[in-house]
From Swiss-Prot:
Residues 166-445 form the Protein kinase domain. Belongs to the protein kinase superfamily. Ser/Thr protein kinase family. The modification Phosphotyrosine is found at residues 239, 339. One of its GO terms (molecular function) is protein serine kinase activity. PANTHER family: OS01G0323000 PROTEIN (PTHR47984), PROTEIN KINASE DOMAIN-CONTAINING PROTEIN (PTHR47984:SF13). The lineage of its organism: Eukaryota, Viridiplantae, Streptophyta, Embryophyta, Tracheophyta. Its main location: membrane. It comes from the Eukaryota. Keywords: ATP-binding, Cell membrane, Kinase, Membrane, Nucleotide-binding, Phosphoprotein, Serine/threonine-protein kinase, Transferase, Transmembrane, Transmembrane helix. This is Probable receptor-like protein kinase At5g18500. ATP binds at residues 172-180, 194. The active site is at residue 292.
């Protein structure tokens, strides 16, 4: 039997004996199995080492819609091509861009809002230069690895160091959304760190809303989002720090020196706020409806420039779009009636809220104050009543040392009353509001005057000459709110 097995194994197949073929096949199988084992082992080690190199904080950030682009406030209309968006000159008047950019240059802040330099010629004219002005970035000196295209990526440790371990002494604001801390980055830049509360995933939602609303926009009157932190369940937003309180504090004398704003400072702050809202509503796509415009959300820097903050309730809307919700958000006293009653939201909701802020700045009163007599509880209704009774001079904030001129008061009152018109379609756009506040004339369109004359059956030629008393009466008549 043994000799038979030997004979079988010794048989010749293509020049090789059978036992040689068996050894070769077994060796090949062994080599293949060994190679596969080594490859799998190497792959496991590689995946482990790579996972150890990436900390928890390096998660993939939430995606930001590509349609939200960085758009400068003073971009010329030629950049719009034929897309149908109004140019800046259409929105703010033919001379406004030059005036705005020159003023910004004088303040040393033009790099933050203008894409073109305006150079003065000897003959007084100006030309545009396509080279943008640049200023040092508040993020200069920080590691570049955390730049992901839509803000700076901070680690939890970065922000712990910046805020002294989120010390209570660093708290500058809190609410249902979370807590805001003052901090200093490693390069010395002061920041405001908004730490969102993570209630049932609400932090993720609030984080996404604010990033989508303001992450890629730039305007000198919008508080700038510098970056964010995503680490574990932590969601934080890092904003520029605005160091001079907010409009509400300055209207109530709640600032450090218990001082009140002058009339000129109030108008400057209101114009800046109006231009920022016009930018959000009319210059970017999708437009941004803030939904919580109020005096405490208008921050003030050391040069008394306004900066709109807190975009936690903001809503993105396409062109000519409205949004209907069953959950009305905002602050009582500032919410537009159509939004409060039916949930209909569009940019005219912000216009109404801005009108209430205007009335606050004029009167120094709260939008709703139950400590006052019943006719004076609601600011909007009380002011309409005072205007109808031709007692406009009596509504001015008594804390103003120097009262505004009669024409300035009338102009601002009329602008405010148009903003708080109960019919949203009659409210002006924010670009119109900015023009009204800057104009030296009453914001009564010539077409409106002509229409009123035609309805009364009179013409310009047939109008009798009026003395100053008649003029004053007519102007007070113009102040009467429509539908109020």
């Amino acid at each position: 039997m043994g000799s038979g097995l030997n004979d079988t194994l010794s048989r010749n197949y293509n020049g090789l004996e059978l036992w040689e073929i068996i050894v070769i096949v077994l060796s090949a199988i062994f080599v293949v199995v060994l190679a596969i084992s080594l490859w799998l082992t190497f792959r496991r080690k590689t995946s482990r080492s790579s996972s150890n190199l990436i900390p928890v904080s390096r998660q993939i950030p939430p995606s930001v819609p590509e349609e939200i682009k960085e758009i400068r406030v003073d971009e010329v209309s030629s950049s719009n091509g034929g897309n149908g968006y109004p140019s800046i000159s259409e929105k703010f008047g033919d001379k406004e861009p030059e005036k705005g950019i020159k003023a910004e240059s004088e303040n040393g802040d033009s790099s933050r809002s203008g894409s073109f330099n305006h150079l003065e010629k000897k003959d007084g004219s100006s030309v545009s230069s396509a080279n943008p002005l640049t200023a040092p970035s508040p993020l200069s000196g920080l590691p570049e690895f955390s730049h992901l295209g839509w803000g700076h990526w901070f680690t939890l440790r970065d922000l712990q160091m910046a805020t002294n371990q989120f010390s209570r002494d660093n708290i500058i604001g809190d609410g249902g959304y979370g807590v805001v801390y003052r901090g200093n980055l490693v390069n010395g830049t002061p920041v405001a760190v908004k730490k969102l509360l993570n209630n049932l995933g609400q932090a993720d939602k609030d984080f996404r809303v604010e990033v989508e609303a303001i992450g890629h926009v730039r305007h000198k009157n919008l508080v700038r989002l510098l970056g964010y932190c995503m680490e574990g369940t932590q969601r934080m937003l890092v904003y520029e720090y605005v160091n001079n309180g907010n409009l509400e504090q300055w209207l109530r004398g709640d600032n450090q020196n218990h001082e009140y704003l002058t009339w000129e400072a109030r108008v400057k702050i209101l114009i800046g706020t109006a231009k920022a809202l016009a930018y959000l509503h009319e210059a970017i796509e999708p437009k941004v409806v803030h939904r919580d415009i109020k005096s405490s959300n208008i921050l003030i820097d050391d040069k008394f420039n306004s900066k709109i903050s807190d975009f936690g309730l903001a809503k993105l809307l396409g062109a000519d779009k409205s949004f209907i919700t069953t959950r009305v958000m905002g602050t009582f006293g500032y919410v537009a009636p159509e939004y409060a009653n039916s949930g209909l939201l569009n940019e005219k909701s912000d216009v109404y809220s801005f009108g209430v802020v205007l009335l606050e700045a004029i009167t120094g009163r709260y939008p709703v104050d139950y400590a006052r007599p019943p006719p004076e509880v609601h600011l909007v209704e009380w002011l309409k009543m005072m205007v109808q009774q031709r007692r406009s001079e009596e509504v001015v904030d008594p804390n103003l040392e120097t009262k505004p001129s009669t024409s300035a008061l009338k102009r601002t009152l009329l602008t405010a009353l148009r903003c708080v018109d109960p019919m949203s379609e009659k409210r002006p756009r924010m670009s119109q509001v900015a023009r009204m506040l800057e104009s030296e004339e009453y914001p009564i369109a010539r077409e409106d005057r002509r229409r009123r004359r035609s309805q009364n059956g009179t013409t310009r030629d047939s109008d009798p000459p009026r003395n100053s008393t008649d003029t004053d009466k007519s102007e007070y008549h113009d102040l009467k709110p429509e539908g109020g």
